[in-house]
Amino acid sequence: MAIIITKQTPVIVQGISGRIGQFHAADMIRYGTNVVGGVTPGKGGSQVLDRPVFNTVREAVEATGAEASLVFVPPPFAADAIMEAADAGIRTAVCVTDGIPSQDMMKVKRFLRRYPEDRKMRLVGPNCAGVISPGQGFLGIMPPHIYMAGRVGIVGRSGTLGYEAASQMKALGIGVSTSVGIGGDPINGSSFKDILALFEADPDTDAVMMIGEIGGPQEAEAAAWVRDHMTKPVVAYIAGLSAPKGRKMGHAGAIISAFGESAQEKVEILSAAGITVAPNPSSMGETMARVLSLRAAA
């Protein structure tokens, strides 16, 4: 079992006819992801990568039974693409697009909130690397060869640090059940808490690697949730220990603007909740290996 995507999940790509969308769709197909079609307005009736292209998401869902969508749509139009997917009945959308205006994402969040829980679409991103369940499929832009199938979940705001964690663990013989990049924007679809809850309920995940960074309250909120609800061990790493206050560091959401948003404060909050924090990025895999060995010996 995996969370969010399995080998059977039927996937469409919004923006499949564009250069970037086509490149990553081809990568997903080679890996074995069940890509059943794509959507590009005005290109309906054509084919890309031997998959049918539709004018609208609703047409694609009705024709293919698609349940998940990967959104490769330029920032000015990405919010409308996400809302179109939700309205068409897509269950999970992963948005890779960077630079979506915060006001547009606020509109998306309000739009998604109107749906009842049994019909609400799960949004991962934007500005994220995507989701991969090794050996089954992926929705995103990550290099799939660095992931080995296993029983540790990864969730992080930084895509490249997620790659690094997976690579380090693979070198130590530790595999991944599912890796989720939630994105680095200040307003995103799924939080650490949302993904941690999925991993907690997943019988094929034994532990979780959580990768945070400066800015925002998500890590502190996740720490409280882990303390009160999580039965599986969580290892964390927080990027930005040397980041100055008030300066954006890479991601739009990576800026220290309030108490509790610096890396050091987040490390203290996570540690107080019983989470093991890796001291630097090169020790993420070793820290997870140590936690797993202690759990096995208990």
List where the protein language model places each region:
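Catalytic-core regions of core metabolic enzymes
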Residues: 1-298
